[in-house]
Design a protein with these regions (language model features):
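Active-site hotspot residues in diverse enzymes, especially metal/ion-binding acidic/histidine motifs
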Residues: 1-310
Length: 310
């Protein structure tokens, strides 16, 4: 709170902020302007929002990389955006209720993550082949995705609105991420939303989300078939580039998956990372997944509203 007061050029006190939060008093125009500037949101946000964002989960999925004032700004933008989107959906008569098909699925191990990924694919009728657009799949299933510019090192966040509406925040800037990483980030945040994570001394929650994302994008059975067997002496750049362009999965993720399945030796895994991947983190020249990864729900709704107003 002290940081927010400082960012707002000290035009508001801690006591006043507390009263605003509890609805006891409303801020004056100059205070609204200063707070909106500090939080990088529209002044319209302070006209009121009835959306409750799960701030603890937003904090958790940031991995501790964001300061509280940055999280507060993201929360404000997310609440404002969500309320406007839901209002648009009501206007055009489009609903998007969400149901978690693997609710209470507990992931403690690599094998649990593989099973959860396979089960969700089966329940969502994805088969075991490539998923053309991960973002469009998530939107179709009722998950709202907001585009936002996130700080360095943070590619995505996830949380709930009113304890019923799943939200994912993604940074889609091409100079920051690759399409393959974007797909992986979306699947990683999906894990945070759908799965339960009992305490585990072996795998952190973030690593378990990574395992789920990897095997959701490239299922174990398909990966083994594409690689021609359960064990390989070495993996070649040419074959993984081909699979990257087909499955939308990075070279790095494929090498990780091969090691997770003990398809390759630790020595070969280390060679790939130390001599190749660490030297080319954006994987330039190693193929590109060309199917567009975009969000489209709000754009389609806006087109319907525009037509209604003509």
């Amino acid at each position: 709170m002290d940081k927010l007061i400082e960012l707002a050029d000290f035009v508001v006190t801690k006591q006043s902020l507390s009263r605003y939060e509890r609805g006891i008093m409303r801020p004056h125009a100059n205070v609204i302007s200063a707070l909106a500037k500090a939080l990088d949101i529209s002044e319209d946000y302070f006209l009121g929002t009835n959306i409750l964002i799960d701030m603890p989960m937003l904090r958790t999925t940031s991995g501790g990389k964001l300061q509280e004032d940055v999280l507060t700004a993201i929360e404000a933008r997310l609440a404002y955006w969500t309320e406007r989107l839901l209002a648009k959906e009501r206007t055009v008569g489009i609903s998007g209720e969400f149901r978690n098909p693997i609710e209470d699925f507990q992931v403690s191990s690599l094998e649990d993550a593989i099973q959860a990924a396979d089960l969700l694919r089966r329940l969502w009728h994805c088969g075991d082949g490539p998923i053309a657009s991960v973002l469009r799949l998530l939107e179709r299933k009722g998950i709202r995705i907001m585009e936002d510019e996130l700080p360095a090192g943070v590619y995505g966040l996830s949380t709930w609105a009113d304890r019923r509406l799943p939200l994912i925040v993604l940074d889609l800037r091409e100079d920051k991420t690759t399409v393959e990483r974007l797909r992986f980030t979306a699947a990683h945040e999906l894990a945070h939303l759908l799965l339960s994570f009992p305490p585990s001394p072996d795998l952190s929650v973030e690593k378990r989300c990574n395992k789920f994302a990897s095997f959701f994008l490239f299922p174990k059975s398909a990966f083994i078939e594409e690689m021609g067997g359960e064990h390989r002496d070495e993996l070649t750049l040419g074959e993984m580039t081909d699979l990257k362009e087909l499955y939308g999965v990075s070279i790095a993720a494929q090498v990780h998956e091969a090691w997770d399945l003990r398809m390759i030796s630790r020595e070969h895994y280390d060679w790939w990372y130390d001599e190749n991947i660490k030297k080319n983190k954006m994987e330039e020249g190693w193929g590109v997944y060309t199917f567009p990864e975009t969000v489209g729900r709000e754009k389609r709704i806006n087109s319907i509203i525009k037509r209604m107003e003509e």
